[in-house]
Amino acid sequence: MNTFTRVLFAAAAMLLGACYPESKNPIAPSSMNVNDSTLEGTWCVREKGQVVFYHMHHSEKDPRGVMNVLGVEVPKNGSKMTQAPMELITARIAGMNVLSFRNTGPKENKTFGFMRYEIDWRGRLKLWMADESTFADAVSTGKLRGKVKKNQFGSDVTLSDTSERIAAFVATQGGKGVFGDDPIVMEKVR
């Protein structure tokens, strides 16, 4: 997944140096997709002086769980704003709200990233990135198909398995260790 999409969608995670697995397929098969109207609207992430807005709405082409997103980064130094169109696919696995995301702009990315999400009692959207080491272990032990490449910071993981098998893996783990501990927190602005 390109840096531009990671920075825009997972601004806080990138600022913290987080890495996450990429997949050729979404986290769940389309039969598990759900429309989640609570995500519709405009959300804002403010982290370490960086401000990123995301406008989310359901896709007219494929409304079952597919959302179009436009991320806009407001630079802190007054330079030009950057934007990235993205696609989200929302689903439920073992009682958890999960999503797959990818860049759909000029530098379209064919791979997906994964997150777990929830709306807290304050109406904030909390997002937990998929844990790279958990998926690296799953590939190394044969629980999932994919490739693991070691790098100076840990591992790069690219899953090639089916959405059905990825969803089954997440379900059998009960979410434990599959997603990070520290959420990205977004405030709804509209």
Task: Annotate each language-model stretch with its function.
Residues 20-38, 46-53, 57-190:
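Calycin-type beta-barrel ligand-binding domains and close structural analogs
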Residues 1-2, 20:
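N-terminal hydrophobic targeting signals that begin at the initiator methionine
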Residues 2-10:
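Sec-dependent signal peptide recognition
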